[in-house]
Amino acid sequence: AFEAGLHVLCEKPAGVYTKQVREMNEAAAKSGKVFAMMFNQRTNCLYRKMHELVTGGSLGAIKRVNWIITDWYRTQSYYDSGDWRATWDGEGGGVLLNQCPHQLDLLQWICGLPKKVQAFCHEGHWHDIEVEDDVTAYLEYENGATGVFVTSTGDAPGTNRFEVDLEWGKLVCENNKLLLYRLSENEREFCKTAKGGFDSPECHVEEVETDGENPQHVGVLNAFTANILHGTPLVARGEEGIRGLTLSNAMHLSSWLHHPVEIPFDEDLYLEELNKRRKTSRKKEATDVTFDTTGSY
């Protein structure tokens, strides 16, 4: 598309593996054309406010990140509906690559990329599939912060709870609300100066006000066309698609190798490991079925 002189809006994920996406980013840079990603969840007022508060620095440094995102429940019928679905050769991954690209993008957009990942990706844990449907990942950041990312397509009912612990409080995004547990003083300073062994800083809970806007796909499309016409900002630059995929690939690679993986990781090694699984990927016949997708996106 870039070689044909076209502007490009890419749906998530940007690709299956980062080496592939890096080539796309290079083609975009050479073309001089507008390149955007369909990261519509960045338009959600709650996540925009989290991004503003965390990156703005008013709450201090990140200490801990926790995201439980398990409200992706899928039946066996869902996986049987396509011969490509949930196969290494056809899709290249499971819940990390299909359901979680938006959350992995938001995680890195709000908190940044970790420096190290240790993940446990359970393949076919809840379904008769060859790719992962249950993942628990431990993250380490450059400043010493840690995190846990949990996802699954086997939990009913599922959970979507995103917590960011910072020096001046904690943000909790859940049930379409953003709560701030605001501390009266910096926890790190309090820890060093408090005289009582069981003292804790004073805390007040408040629901964070937002602008209430959540334009989703329309917002991304409007920003894309406005950028082409007027040069105004995109919701997400296309080159950023590689960042969430970096997290996904690092989790896969860590699980395959059974040890922590540093970011950036060896992209050639990742592709080598993926191709091993592609070669043994099983062929399956799809079931002819029609789904009601209301409320699934």
Where are the model-predicted features located?
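Beta-strand-loop-alpha-helix segment that lines the small-molecule cofactor/substrate pocket
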Residues: 1-42, 57
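Glycine-rich phosphate/pyrophosphate-binding beta-alpha loops
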Residues: 101, 126, 150-158
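Active-site beta-strand termini and strand-to-loop segments that position acidic
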Residues: 132, 137-143, 164-166
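C-terminal glycine/acidic-rich active-site capping loop/insertion
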Residues: 141, 166-239, 261, 272-297
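A contiguous, mid-protein "functional segment" used to position or interact
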Residues: 235-272
